[in-house]
């Protein structure tokens, strides 16, 4: 049987992973690499890292440009 402490650690990491996927590193307008180098929000723009963040260009930042940025653009 899995120990309670191990289960709690796994649960904590799962929660952190979900939060990171939603908001990235740095809160509502943060995000790992979000909006790096362009757009109204500048460095760290966008609240949902995979959809709104990314690095450089586009109206809201984002590697691929597009209205809301994001690494692959939109």
Curated annotation (Swiss-Prot):
It comes from Caenorhabditis elegans. GO terms for cellular component: extracellular region. The lineage of its organism: Eukaryota, Metazoa, Ecdysozoa, Nematoda, Chromadorea. It is found in: Secreted. Keywords: Amidation, Antimicrobial, Fungicide, Neuropeptide, Secreted, Signal. May have antifungic activity against D.coniospora. Induction: Strongly up-regulated upon D.coniospora infection. The gene is nlp-33. The keyword Signal applies. This is Neuropeptide-like protein 33. The keyword Repeat does not apply. The modification Tyrosine amide is found at residue 72. Belongs to the YARP (YGGW-amide related peptide) family. Residues 1-21 form the signal peptide.
